Regions:
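Metal-cofactor-dependent catalytic cores
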Residues: 1-67
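Short, solvent-exposed amphipathic alpha-helical segments in soluble enzyme
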Residues: 23, 88-91, 207-212
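SAM-dependent methyltransferases
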Residues: 61-71, 96-99, 129, 217, ...
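Glycine-rich phosphate/diphosphate-binding loop of Rossmann-like nucleotide-binding domains
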Residues: 66-112
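Short beta-strand segments
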Residues: 74-75, 135-136, 194-196
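N-terminal small/polar loop signature for handling phosphorylated ligands or for N-terminal nucleophile
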Residues: 96-98, 103-135, 140-155
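Proline/glycine-rich low-complexity loops and linkers
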Residues: 147-230
Length: 230
């Protein structure tokens, strides 16, 4: 899985991605007429430099038990993606995750576009294999609020309790909490949760659910035991 480390001679590598989306409209494509970049295999970052030769043996290293959970944050906003509005919710989520011990691998600012959101959810869950994806925005009744539908379309298992808990908590603050259509699902070992768009609502909801997420994420990843309490 992503995060696995290998040694080869003096070099130390960490897997960062499995497979790669073809960037069919990149500069290479424009010049060559086709993509010549690799699309298969695994990709790794160099943790410690060294020399690798053809035929060298790659040694799989034990995964440390204390590795931080890995997260990604996606802000959905037409105006934000066009530079017409500052994204305040995304950075707030990053701050709260980091303070709780998560490693935020990526932050994205997208328009309310179903195709773009689906592409990124699939990439982050399947190729990057992050443990948690938090989206913000697009959970209301407006015509372009498509976040829950896209989230459900990539789901392999439902995890409704998280979204239900957020609605319950929001209703203790405002009756408008019932208008949230946020979804929470699992794709593989990745938990995907839709948060509201406003910074105030993001803070209220994330403070409420964040203490319980890590255990669920670790269960999904096969890192923790059962949920039963003695």
């Amino acid at each position: 899985p992503v995060g696995t480390r290998f040694s080869c001679g003096d070099a130390l590598l960490e897997m960062t991605q499995i497979g790669k989306e073809c960037h069919s409209h990149c500069e290479i494509f424009k010049r060559m007429g086709e993509c010549i970049m690799p699309r298969e295999g695994v990709f790794a970052r160099v943790v410690k430099g060294g020399t690798i030769h053809t035929g060298d043996e790659m040694k799989l290293l034990p995964t440390p038990a204390d590795l931080p959970l890995r997260a990604a944050v996606i802000t959905l906003s037409d105006k934000g993606s066009h530079g017409e509005r500052e994204d305040k919710s995304g950075p707030l989520i990053v701050e709260m995750l980091t303070a709780t011990g998560y490693k935020v691998e990526e932050t994205l600012l997208l328009p309310d576009d179903a195709a773009q959101l689906k592409t990124q959810l699939l990439r982050l869950a399947d190729a990057r294999q992050v443990n948690l994806i938090l989206t913000t925005g697009g959970t209301g009744f407006a015509p372009r609020d498509i976040t829950p539908e896209v989230t459900l379309s990539v789901a392999e298992r439902n995890a409704p309790g998280i979204a239900e808990a957020m609605r319950y908590h929001s209703l203790t603050i405002t009756p408008r909490g019932m208008l949230s259509r946020a979804a929470s699902v699992l794709r593989g070992k990745t938990l995907i949760v839709n948060l509201p768009g406003s910074p105030k609502a993001v803070k209220e909801n994330l403070e409420y659910i964040l203490p319980s997420l890590a255990h669920g994420i670790r269960l999904a990843a096969g890192l923790d035991g059962e949920c039963a309490r003695k």
